[in-house]
Amino acid sequence: MLFPVIVKKLKTMEVSILIIRQERPEDYDTVYHVVKEAFENAEYTDGNEQNLVAALRKSKSFIPELSLVAVEDEKIVGHILFTKAVVQGVEVLALAPLSVLPDYQNRGIGLSLMKEGHSIAHKLGYEYSVVLGHSKYYSKAGYIPASECGIKAPFEVDDESFMALNLNGSQNKLNGVIEYDKAFGI
C-alpha cells in the first residue's frame, strides 16, 4: 500500500511527492546504507543501528507491516522500524530506529514516517509505542514521558528521553519495565 505525502523542498521550493510504503526485501541493502548514513553524525549513536535493523528483521519481534520506507523521486530517503516489546505481559511497540538521509532531514519526513507507522499500529491493535530519543523531536508526534504511561526503562535514563505514545486513546495505564527483543542487547 502506498501513502503519498506532499513535501516542499526547502532549498528550491519545488514540490515533490513522498511515498511511504512497506519495506520490501529488495530494499534491504539500500535501507542498510540509509540507516548507516543517517546516524553517521548523530549526537547519540553506537554506530550499529544498521546492523540492529538487520538483526530485528530476523527476530520474532519483527512486524513487516511496521517496517516502512519513505521514497522521494524513486529514491529511498528514510526508514522507520517498530518491533514488538512487552510490558507486564502486554505487547507494545518499540520504535527504533527512525532514519532519514541527512540531505532530507528537517523536512517532515521522519514525522510522516511516524504518523503512518502509528496509524498502521493502531489498526493492528497495538496500544503503545515506546521510543528512546530527543524529547523535543518525538513530542511533535505526541510522545510523552513513558513514566506517565506506567512504562519503565530496563536501564538508567532520564524521564524526558524515554517516551511513549498511547496509540488508541485508551485509559489503560501499564505498570512495568519494558522488555525489548534480545537483538537490542539490553
PLM features: what roles do these ranges have?
Residues 1-16:
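N-terminal amphipathic/basic-hydrophobic helices that include classical n-h-c signal peptides
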Residues 95, 100, 106-119, 130-131:
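Conserved acetyl-CoA-binding loop-helix of GNAT-fold acetyltransferases
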